[in-house]
A protein has these predicted regions:
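Condensing-enzyme catalytic core mediating Claisen C-C bond formation in acyl metabolism
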Residues: 1-27, 36, 219-284, 288, ...
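N-terminal extracellular/periplasmic Venus flytrap/periplasmic-binding protein-like
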Residues: 10-12, 23-32, 40, 169-260, ...
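Conserved catalytic cysteine-centered active-site region
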Residues: 55-104, 146-151, 216-242, 323-350, ...
């Protein structure tokens, strides 16, 4: 069976909540990276067999592939696996290619958390009289547990307590992430992966081509921030990921197709995994997902040259580092979501793309990307360049 390869990819800069990308919808962000990734792959839009894209907050947003100029005959599907949506899109693309059901698939994710609407649950039937309720789509379908209504961060706080991670440890991890991201931005490490996006403002058209939040952060304030999820808690806005806007796409095909059509290969997908446990334990689910993907790849922890473990909360990345003996210096080498942000439907493909370019810059070969998913799940991908 021919291996599955990634032949191109791109992402937008990560925009802050109500920040630089706030005037663009998720499909507009998605269209930018779909269009750019197809162009970078050196294929024509009509050669694409399917677009598989993640998006969590999809109420009323429309379609990205149409805005990207992909022809009408190309199929498309939207994936909602919460924070794992974009990585699941990549996993589904890989499986579809393995089955021989397609030759070229664009996979990734998009999210404009800024533009997530508010919902009127009883509007269709009529409120008749009395007080009504407006629900926040972002909270209801993105940041809250479906069964209990608790915020995801409250579960992270519980697990941080269970694992004994202190405020100082999590703040130090977040500060390290922020410093790495700031260095990556100032040194231009992200330039290859980012597609500039034009945004219309009152002053004219502005080009957004740099992650918005890391250079705005004040390192000195991090230890002074109030707990976010409990009065005496240790998790804060700084050692958590920030609400963000962005998109990332990858073009996948088989190694055989790439070779026969003269396409350059960025990376090969060596193995994938999905893991689930109790919903309250989603923050440590990446540990088992990583173990599974390493077993399937036939790799040891020490053989992996670089890791992208999504920092939904600092403790999510810290847990596998401690449990599996991962060298922290190899994790999120250009910073993670505590610094860059976490547009929930896009992060899964963003971290794969960033991992590819980190390996490329470092002259290394093997990498693993993993993230936690609300509901108790996690996914992981092992790649080789």
């Amino acid at each position: 069976m021919s291996s599955i390869v990634i032949v191109s990819g791109s992402r937008t800069a990560m925009g802050g909540f109500q920040g630089s990308l706030s005037s663009l919808t998720a499909p507009e962000l998605g269209a930018a990276v779909i269009r750019e990734s197809i162009q970078r792959a050196g294929v024509k839009p009509e050669q694409v067999d399917e677009v598989i894209f993640g998006c969590v907050l999809s109420a009323g947003i429309g379609q990205a592939m149409r805005k990207a100029g992909v022809p009408d005959h190309v199929g498309a599907v939207t994936i909602n696996k919460l924070c794992g949506s974009a990585m699941k899109a990549v996993l589904m693309a890989s499986d579809t290619l393995k089955a021989g059901s397609a030759n070229i698939i664009v996979a990734g994710g998009m999210e404009s958390m800024t533009n997530a609407p508010y919902i009127l649950p009883k509007a269709r039937g009529g409120y008749r009289m009395g007080h009504g309720e407006i629900k926040d789509h972002m909270f209801l379908d993105g940041l809250e547990d479906a069964e209990t209504g608790r915020l995801m961060g409250s579960f992270a706080q519980d697990m941080a307590n269970t694992k004994g991670f202190t405020r100082e440890q999590m703040d130090d991890f977040a500060i390290s992430s922020l410093k790495k991201a700031q260095t990556a931005i100032t040194e231009g490490y992200f330039k290859e992966e980012i597609v500039p996006v034009e945004v219309k403002t009152r002053k004219g058209v502005e080009v957004v081509d740099q992650d918005e939040q890391p250079l705005k952060a004040n390192l000195e304030k991090i230890p002074t921030l109030r707990p976010a999820f409990s009065k005496d808690g240790t998790i804060t806005a700084a050692n958590s990921s920030s609400i963000s806007d962005g998109a990332a796409a990858l073009v996948l095909t088989t190694e055989e197709y790439a070779q026969s059509h003269g396409l350059n290969t960025l990376a090969k997908i060596v193995a994938t995994s999905t893991h689930s446990q109790h919903p309250s334990e989603f923050t440590i689910a990446p540990i088992s997902a990583i173990q599974k993907v390493l077993e399937r790849a036939g790799w040891s922890v020490d053989e992996v040259d670089a890791w992208e473990i999504n920092e939904a909360f600092a403790m999510v990345a810290m847990a596998p580092i401690h449990e599996l003996g991962i060298d922290e210096a190899k994790v999120n080498v250009h910073g993670g979501a505590c610094a860059l942000g976490h547009p929930i439907g896009a992060t899964g493909s963003r971290i794969i793309l960033s991992l590819i370019y980190a390996l490329k810059r470092l002259g290394k070969k093997k990498g693993v990307a993993a993230l936690c998913i609300g509901g108790g799940e996690a996914t992981a991908v092992a790649i080789e360049i």
